[in-house]
């Protein structure tokens, strides 16, 4: 496995990336000499990889137990974390146990918060199984779950000891989830690492079919992009906030969709909304907005608010964005990451956030509603 040293201020951990490397992955976990391996995954990943990983660990590393949670964003909450904690303690977890987060971003957050809370903190190792997790969520110290008022509002910061990524696990990933991951890749190219954009444009596939070489390049570039901004900002409260590009409207769309819209798909639309807002406010050019649409289309993602979502709901959730409080904003504004051009975030007092009038943001959301539907009519949720 290729090793990249991740440094976020005083937080350091290795990111190991390979293909068809299950034996090496288990060997790396075995080095931890855990009293018990607590493998956390959802019920789908349990059937694909969870039972096999537990069996391999039992054979070659030490005692292991599988802790499962239900699939979906609606289960990413404190209730799930509490239930898993009870299961872990009932299975004999102690301070020398290791939490293995086997899955995508939802599982990573659930398991990360679990590791931070058990005995006030035990070892956490990420084994990501989705594109979003491999190139984005496992590279953050943020471990959070949702509340009824919005996404990622309850959590803490907690460092993983290691990331072990095997691209072979992406072969079972539904096309919807692969496209979702590419939404975050496009974000990296637009907001953080514009030098990767041209090659990325040639690699992106609307059919979501990528070979291992392409995936390794995409993941490695995205890891480097995230490291560029978190190296001196481990809590992502300064320059690291640029990684929130597209997430203000993206999170609102996800929440309004009640799980029917994948994270990266929401972020993709959120980026177009942010670009259009920046253009309306006189900062971004029309050609830069078009570049957003080009890359998003090449990734097989939509660039309008999905028809399954009521725009009135999106506008409501925008007022609960988790970046509120970073800036002293008027009641009729909300803080957003906006770009003036590739890799050029607008700033307020050195921070890559600007107050955006809610009237302009809401008008843009309405303008980007999927054709043929009003903002308040009701639709059946269809996954995107």
Curated annotation (Swiss-Prot):
Cofactor(s) recorded in Swiss-Prot or TrEMBL: NAD(+); Co(2+)
Pathway(s) per entry: Metabolic intermediate biosynthesis; 2-deoxystreptamine biosynthesis; 2-deoxystreptamine from D-glucose 6-phosphate: step 1/4; Antibiotic biosynthesis; lividomycin biosynthesis
Record carries keyword Lyase: yes
Catalysed transformations (reactions): D-glucose 6-phosphate = 2-deoxy-L-scyllo-inosose + phosphate
Pfam families cross-referenced by the UniProt entry: DHQ_synthase, DHQS_C
Superkingdom of the organism of origin: Bacteria
E.C. numbers: 4.2.3.124
Similarity section: Belongs to the sugar phosphate cyclases superfamily. DOI synthase family.
Protein name (record): 2-deoxy-scyllo-inosose synthase
Lineage: Bacteria, Bacillati, Actinomycetota, Actinomycetes, Kitasatosporales
């Amino acid at each position: 496995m290729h090793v990249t040293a991740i440094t976020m201020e005083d937080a350091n951990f290795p990111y190991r990336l390979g293909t068809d490397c299950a034996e090496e992955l288990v060997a790396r976990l075995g080095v931890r000499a855990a009293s018990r391996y607590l493998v956390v995954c959802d019920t789908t990943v349990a059937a694909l990889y969870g039972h096999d990983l537990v069996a391999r660990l039992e054979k070659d590393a030490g005692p292991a137990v599988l802790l499962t949670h239900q699939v979906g964003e609606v289960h990413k909450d404190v209730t799930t974390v509490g239930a898993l904690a009870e299961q872990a303690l009932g299975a004999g977890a102690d301070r020398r146990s290791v939490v293995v987060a086997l899955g995508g971003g939802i599982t990573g957050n659930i398991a990360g918060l679990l590791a931070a809370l058990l005995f006030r903190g035990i070892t956490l190792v990420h084994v990501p199984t989705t594109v979003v997790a491999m190139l984005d969520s496992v590279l953050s110290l943020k471990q959070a779950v949702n509340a009824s008022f919005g996404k990622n509002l309850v959590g803490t910061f907690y460092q993983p000891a290691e990331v072990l990524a095997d691209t072979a696990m992406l072969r079972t990933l539904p096309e919807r989830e692969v496209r979702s991951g590419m939404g975050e890749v496009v974000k990296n190219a637009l907001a953080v690492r514009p030098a990767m954009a041209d090659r990325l444009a040639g690699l992106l596939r609307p059919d979501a079919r990528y070979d291992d070489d392409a995936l390794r390049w995409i993941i490695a570039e995205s890891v480097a992009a995230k490291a560029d901004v978190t190296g001196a900002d481990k809590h992502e409260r300064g320059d690291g906030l640029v990684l929130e590009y597209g997430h203000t409207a993206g999170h609102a769309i996800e929440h309004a969709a009640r799980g029917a819209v994948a994270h990266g798909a929401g972020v993709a639309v959120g980026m177009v909304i942010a670009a259009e807002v920046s253009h309306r406010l006189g900062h971004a050019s029309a050609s830069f907005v078009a570049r957003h649409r080009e890359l998003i289309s090449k990734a097989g993602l939509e660039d309008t608010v999905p028809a399954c979502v009521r725009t009135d709901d999106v506008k409501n959730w925008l007022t609960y964005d988790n970046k509120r409080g970073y800036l002293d904003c008027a009641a009729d504004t909300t803080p957003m990451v906006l770009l003036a051009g590739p890799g050029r975030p607008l700033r307020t007092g050195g921070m890559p956030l600007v107050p955006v009038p809610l009237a302009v943001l809401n008008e843009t959301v309405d303008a980007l509603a999927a054709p043929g539907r009003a903002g308040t009519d009701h639709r059946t949720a269809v996954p995107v």
